UniProtKB/Swiss-Prot annotation:
Protein name, as recorded: Pupal cuticle protein
UniProt xrefs under InterPro entries: CHIT_BIND_RR_consensus, Cuticle_Struct_Prot, Insect_cuticle
The keyword Signal belongs to this UniProt entry's keyword annotation: yes
Keyword Isomerase among record annotations: no
Length: 192
């Protein structure tokens, strides 16, 4: 038992030493890194701009428009030696990164989105009972395909396609179908 406790103690000390060494590890390429450029401009209206670059190849720039939109980019060198670059725009439609290392949207997904956009469908209006044609908004479709490069581009929507229909109020109880009581089964002569 004493031997087992000693073994656990030695293992705990070794694990602690390895954790300290792993946390203190800094690759040789990063050990003597210098900041080559560091610029920051902040204006009273909320607009800002920053850029930095280090001697080990890491760089970033970003420009913000008063909390409404941001655009920028960054790059670094991967452990394999290739330069990884990302440029992006973030605005009311979301975050849109662009980079060679980011997977492209498969062609079959683009074709499916195009088919959905090009084929409006009909919905029965709950209140009036009439059929209304609903089309997908081209602007929403463009958000999905904004940053797709070297892929098929969506065709513009024909001007005859109707706009999206939105119902203006929630259903009320008077619009709901009426309830009917369930009929009770009569004694069936087959069941005995």
């Amino acid at each position: 038992m004493h031997l087992l406790m000693s073994l656990f103690g030695v293992l705990a000390v070794m694990q602690q030493q390895l954790a300290v060494r792993a946390a203190a590890y800094i690759p040789d390429s990063d050990r003597n890194t210098k900041t080559l450029q560091n610029d920051l401009q902040v204006e009273r209206d909320g607009n800002y701009r920053y850029a930095y670059e280090t001697s080990n190849g890491i760089s970033a720039t970003q420009e913000g428009l008063g909390g409404v939109s941001v655009q920028g980019g960054s790059s670094y060198t991967s452990p394999e030696g290739s330069v990884i670059s990302v440029s992006y725009v973030a605005d009311e439609t979301g975050y849109h990164p662009v980079g060679d290392h980011i997977p492209k949207v498969p062609d079959y997904i683009l074709r499916a989105l195009e088919y959905i956009r090009a084929h409006p469908y009909q919905v029965k209006d709950y209140y009036t009972g009439e059929l209304k044609t609903v089309a997908h908004d081209a602007a929403a479709f463009n958000v999905y395909t904004r940053n797709i490069q070297d892929q098929t581009t969506p065709r513009s929507r024909p001007s005859s396609t109707p706009k999206t229909i939105y119902l203006t109020h929630p259903p009320t109880l008077s619009d709901a179908p009426t309830r009917r009581p369930l009929r009770q089964r009569q004694n069936d002569s087959r069941r005995r």
